């Protein structure tokens, strides 16, 4: 089912309730919502009109918009049935990890302070 929920403050909770994130866009820049969905552990299905730079995990598929509806449906169903770990260690080990980000920021501030 598709539901338009309007402006929300509880997006993280909504992602946790989803099985799959689907973005069949005709045009996109870099969709932050697609990045958020991946970092929530969701498998993501994007149209081929979404730039590949949005891919941060191995749970992303790009599907041509001109593919048959049935092909899209089969890909979404397969992604929903895939119950592999949504925690995704590759995210935990990435530069987006909070501990690594904090270390990078601390090092940056130390570098700035050393110039004073």
Q: What residues fall within each predicted segment?
A:
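Nucleotide-activated donor-binding/catalytic signature segment of Leloir-type glycosyltransferases, i.e.
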Residues: 1-6
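Aromatic "clamp/platform" in nucleotide-sugar-dependent glycosyltransferases that forms part
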Residues: 7, 26
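Short glycine/acidic-rich beta->alpha loop that forms part of the nucleotide-sugar donor binding site
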Residues: 11-14, 28-31, 38
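An anion/phosphate-binding loop that grips the pyrophosphate of nucleotide cofactors and donors
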Residues: 18
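A short hydrophobic beta-strand element within the catalytic core of glycosyltransferases
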Residues: 21-22
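Short hydrophobic beta-strand element within catalytic cores of glycosyltransferases
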Residues: 34, 43-47, 52
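A charged, aromatic-enriched C-terminal amphipathic alpha-helix characteristic of glycosyltransferases
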Residues: 83-116
